[in-house]
Amino acid sequence: MTIKKEIKNLFLQKRFSEIIFLIESKFEEKTPEILNILAISRLSQQRSREIYKQSLSEFEEAYLKDKNSQDGLNALMNYLNAAADLDDYLGHQDTSNFSKFFLDQSVKFFKEAENKFGYNPKLILLGIRIFKRLNQLDTILIYYKKLFDKNDLNLLTFTSWIFFNNYKTYWNQKDYFKFTKLLDLHIPNIPNEKLINLSKKKNDKIKIGFLSSDINKSHSITFFLKTICAYYNKKE
């Protein structure tokens, strides 16, 4: 069995630590394909600030080694995804700007690849992930429009495009009506027999739900919930 076949089998079995050891011990010169596998294996095995840094370095090396090939493009798309994931991993509470360098590099590489490869919906969606984390709203809307013009929006990305237009005044009420109606084309039809009947039974319990992307101990909603639970009198 060749080393590449062995790596493939290990990857299918998700034995990532063995892949990392095998590549680091057997490959003195690593191709873009091997660098891609190595970096993916690192991130699949463990997530940390240093692991992200090392994996991003390997994705970058793979891209720079062969910018014009599919392997190079794959490495770049992995770089964009990992850079966005790193920013999410560190969270808003991180003030070191550690991820900012990788986000800025992502923009540079994205523009470069777009000029080289032309329209690529997967590349654009990953670019949008980066632009969101850099708060580049106008750029986000430009690329969502490109996807719309090519009929490459799905339900999730279509609703995201509508949502981000709320922060601008480009659309009027007719535009919102027009595009929200188009959502019907992306919503699956659910047969009646698969629908769940909602209970109409009433009781004295009050049920309250809160939805937030970042509820934590210092979040304002947490203090609100504490006061509700502490002082609520169900007899009144």
Task: Please report, for each region that a protein language model flagged, where it lies by residue.
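Alpha-helical solenoid repeat scaffolds of the TPR/TPR-like class and their adjacent stem/linker regions
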Residues: 1-236
